[in-house]
Amino acid sequence: MKKLFGLLFLLPFIGTAQDCKLIRETDPFTKETKISTGFIFVNGGSLTIDADKKEVVVLFSINNTGRCFDNNSTAIIIFDGLKSKTSARNGGTMNCEGLFQFVFKNSASTTTILQRLMTYKIASIVFTDSNKKESTLTVAPADQDVILKLATCLINESKTLL
């Protein structure tokens, strides 16, 4: 009887674990595992979250080609249900392909921005490029749920790579 209650208690966790559809790749040379959400398409561009044992990278691809981003470019994330905005700088290299990155060290503790990605839905993100021009990614409610679920799965799974 106790075992039955134990199994019933674990059932919700097993059900949600099966919803994580992450892409898992192993580098043939280094034998290191990398996990990814794959690209999630939103209004104005797309995003993907990747992780290996060293870092977690959130990569945004903005549709407006010709947008140049450097280390002084910024992004302001507006979360649903949160009054304050989150601001971050580009962690990637200078490019004019419309690519913007947040780069975080993969560690046992989760940084504030990653924690917010796991707990709040993204309403929109405003990117300011190297020419001080703004581009906005707007996230539809259905996409908000997908991003929240995949971000939570990937960030939790990234801890197993350490």
Annotate the PLM regions.
Residues 1-23:
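Bacterial Sec-dependent N-terminal signal peptides
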Residues 7-9, 48-50, 65-67, 94, ...:
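Generic marker of residues within folded, mature protein domains
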Residues 59-61, 76-78, 126:
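Residue-level recognition of well-ordered beta-strand positions that form the cores
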Residues 27-31, 75-78, 104, 160-162:
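Extracellular/mature segments of secreted proteins
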